[in-house]
Amino acid sequence: MTPNWSELVAAADPALVLPSGERRAEVAVPGPLRLDALLDLGEGHAVGVVRSADAARWTVPLVRDGAGGVRRSRPGDGTAEHLVAALARRGATPDAAFVLEAFTGAAPVTGERGIIVDQTNESVIVGECAVVKWAVRLPAEGEPGSPAAQRIAALARGGFTEMPRPWGLLTLAEGAQPVLLASVVAYLPGALDGWDWAVDDVRRLARGELTMDQALLPAAQLGTLTARMHAALAARGRTPATAADVAAWGVRMREELDEAVASVPGAEGERLKAWAPRIADVYAELDALAGTPLIDVHGDFHVGQILRADGRYAVVDFDGNPVLPADQRAARQPAALDVVGMTASLDHVGRVVVFRTPDVDPAPVRAWIAAAQRSFLDAYRTTLARLDADDLFDDRLLTPLRYAQEVREYLYAVRHLPHWVYVPDLSLTDLLPERLKD
């Protein structure tokens, strides 16, 4: 008698839940495993929601092996192909625990290869046409999952096209917010993210290979993209920030500032320590901002989330800020959060160019930083007004949120990349009015 999927999963090595890209030697998964739910894709392929002995839950693309067992599907095995084929059929899933939502354009394609990058999720390119992204670790029952499914669906329904065209979503029907198991979007061959294309553009500007107008055009295009994204996301609704919301922002920002002051070493730390009381005073301005509109936002918005291919721009990764708890990633936020994320990253592109380019003239780069941020904001405001959505954006949040973003850059440097400390140090040096530096 052939063992069923549940029996095969229970007998498998607990490392079954880990993708090959994850450092298996450093991640101990306790067994035995238990199969909570299974979507059978046919021909020995399935998607399982698997629970380890510590109650952690995992999305596992499964394939039966030649020895009568089961293993995690690898790129080339065909499980991602079978998921895309299921989307193309647009049929209901045989198990009510799963929701398979197909958008326009899903079609059966063949051929798989993995994307070799360090990421939380596992991605497979199918037929050089689509990218299947498997969510690896799932939230505990009752906890909110990734907001990506709802945000991608809202953008697709709202006619937002500045993202890789969504083919479909696989979710687990659980509670008020479905849990995302896999997303399928169009593959953009040759696409570069902003830490490549934007740095290259500004470097070419500094070398005289681009005019200032040419180098500023992407910033304006990103401003338009961001406004269209926010207008589409806001169609899901908006809520006013309460006094408690605003107070919580201030508490979190002051805690981060205190941590940065205590942990940033050297001359950069001394400068931050001197600036900290003035930055905290700016944070106090938040107290007057109860009532500002909150909407679904991207949540981790910077140039690295913007792909450029064939002169077009596409925003990716709607999972929210990975360092935040799931409930905060899913919560509505001010539109200014995304605006600040992008304007700060435009600034940081310029800092990187000056730091990494020998003999570069910093003057045109610094001029580009200021002009690019203005171009972005002007296009953003103009597009919101054209969409009758200018009430989404409260520009009183720009300064406190921007200071908070640079403080988080200090913390990122301390925790992960020590040399990065030059970026927020230079940014705040230019950002802070002279009166705040005294």
Swiss-Prot record:
The keyword Coiled coil does not apply. InterPro entries: GlcN_kinase, Kinase-like_dom_sf. Keywords: ATP-binding, Carbohydrate metabolism, Kinase, Magnesium, Metal-binding, Nucleotide-binding, Transferase. It is an enzyme of class 2 (transferase). It catalyses: D-glucosamine + ATP = D-glucosamine 6-phosphate + ADP + H(+). Its EC number is 2.7.1.8. Mg(2+) 2 binds at D317, D319. Binds 2 Mg(2+) ions per subunit. GO terms for molecular function: ATP binding; glucosamine kinase activity; magnesium ion binding. Its cofactor is Mg(2+). Gene3D superfamilies: 3.90.1200.10. Mg(2+) 1 binds at Q305, D317. ATP binds at K133, A186, Y187, L188, D193. A motif (Substrate specificity determinant motif) lies at residues 405-420. GO terms for biological process: carbohydrate metabolic process. D-glucosamine binds at D300, E409. Belongs to the actinobacterial glucosamine kinase family. Monomer. Catalyzes the ATP-dependent phosphorylation of D-glucosamine (GlcN) to D-glucosamine 6-phosphate. May be involved in the phosphorylation of acquired extracellular GlcN derived from the hydrolysis of chitosan, i.e., in the incorporation of exogenous GlcN into the bacterial GlcNAc metabolism. To a lesser extent, is also active on glucose, but is unable to phosphorylate maltose, 18 other sugars and several aminoglycoside antibiotics. This is Glucosamine kinase. It comes from Streptacidiphilus jiangxiensis.
